[in-house]
Amino acid sequence: MRLFNWRRQAALNAMPLVKPDQVRTPWHEFWRRFRRQHMAMTAALFVILLIVVAIFARWIAPYDAENYFDYDNLNNGPSLQHWFGVDSLGRDIFSRVLVGAQISLAAGVFAVFIGAAIGTLLGLLAGYYEGWWDRLIMRICDVLFAFPGILLAIAVVAVLGSGIANVIIAVAIFSIPAFARLVRGNTLVLKQQTFIESARSIGASDMTILLRHILPGTVSSIVVFFTMRIGTSIISAASLSFLGLGAQPPTPEWGAMLNEARADMVIAPHVAVFPALAIFLTVLAFNLLGDGLRDALDPKIKG
């Protein structure tokens, strides 16, 4: 017996000790998988830079985006004085693109946030309670899905009136059913799990089960979809502004800038190129970031 105890103690002593900082938490696993994706990391850095620029745009911009006019260089192309050139009114395009990032990004993020908040609530209710709750909410979502998103947004803005605030509301409305269906599907799966039955058996309320057990299980899907939906919302907001239903001149919103550039595209293509490039790169970055988050949060679905 002593020999056995001695051998067991020797084996335990030979085992390497795991230090606290060597324990891999879910966050460490996520970061390890995410940083291996070079495209997603590049997109994340671009998004971080974009957010910083959007926050400090009015301090970074070399000229006033709305009230500066260089009448001696109308429609001139890029130069050392004006990096992105000048538009037909003499305004510095670089300054307007920087400030436009603030407006376009805010419109996209706020619209998706509103849509995600309402859609998540509806999806939880529909998936958990089912019955008439599920039928009512899903039929409303079906009606909203019956219309193309941009047409629905145009109809909402036509009723509410033009302006960036109404654009945010319009884009949020057609984001709601997408989040509702996503969360409903996850809720239907999670509510069948044994840990939900265990929570019910100990007397947990529906609110506790929804907030403490089901909602955390849907967060990863919501985060991924939220990120990718921002790109869609930015395009939608820019499209409405391009049609004259969103931000109004002289507000330097990217879609509104493209609308103003239509008359001068032949003689001064740079007036349209840089706002369009800003929209393209921003949407691409959010989509790549969303793909990276999806693969890092759930590597089983990769490929």
From Swiss-Prot:
Q: Which GO terms describe its cellular component?
A: plasma membrane
> Which keywords annotate this record?
Cell inner membrane, Cell membrane, Membrane, Transmembrane, Transmembrane helix, Transport
Q: Which GO terms describe its molecular function?
A: dipeptide transmembrane transporter activity
| Presence of the UniProt keyword Cell membrane in the record | yes
Subcellular location(s) per record: Cell inner membrane
Q: Does the keyword Membrane apply?
A: yes
Name a Pfam family for this protein: BPD_transp_1
Q: Which SUPFAM superfamilies match?
A: MetI-like
Matching entries from InterPro entries are given as: BP-dependent_transpt_permease (IPR050366), MetI-like (IPR000515), MetI-like_sf (IPR035906), OppC_N (IPR025966)
Which residue windows are transmembrane per the record?
A: 40-60, 105-125, 144-164, 165-185, 222-242, 266-286
| Stored PROSITE patterns | ABC_TM1
Q: List the Gene3D superfamilies hit by this protein, alphabetically.
A: MetI-like
Q: How does it assemble?
A: The complex is composed of two ATP-binding proteins (GsiA), two transmembrane proteins (GsiC and GsiD) and a solute-binding protein (GsiB).
Function summary? Part of the ABC transporter complex GsiABCD involved in glutathione import. Probably responsible for the translocation of the substrate across the membrane.
State the family it belongs to.
Answer: Belongs to the binding-protein-dependent transport system permease family.
Please identify the protein, giving its name as recorded.
Glutathione transport system permease protein GsiD
Q: Organism, per UniProt?
A: Escherichia coli O6:H1 (strain CFT073 / ATCC 700928 / UPEC)
